[in-house]
């Protein structure tokens, strides 16, 4: 069978691609039977530590300092850390564990990648429809995506747990994110995404 490639007629919108991927997941992931393994990828403790070591304060500055090593030192190591976290959860008995760090749309779509916000909305849909719990890897409060995964779980009533399986209640989450923001800003980082996330967290009423 010959596969047709680079056909303009096959270009899909983000919504069409998201619906297609959700439909694929329906084949083997029943509703709300998965756990979501949230782990840092683009931003997080590893990224900020490397920035401090290399006198950088943005991804662009760090990539300029490290060159090709940037993808290995940050993205590749974070991907492996995320995979390891998911494996740990499976070893604890969770049959279906979904981790976002290995997902890459551009590899499947002729190099046309999604935007960061499109990835985030897609994972929000996955969390809402496929997961009953979210596990947050260690130092999650320093990662933009992890904090927004927490918010997605909060909105949809999921169990919210840290890497050791302890419940992460709203008041604790607010304090952790606030502390992370203060620490990073003390070092000169502009963490507007974490500020946005904290603003959202403050709109929820504390329960438990």
Protein language model features and the residues they cover:
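Conserved catalytic or regulatory cores that recognize and/or transform ribose-phosphate-containing ligands
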Residues: 1-208
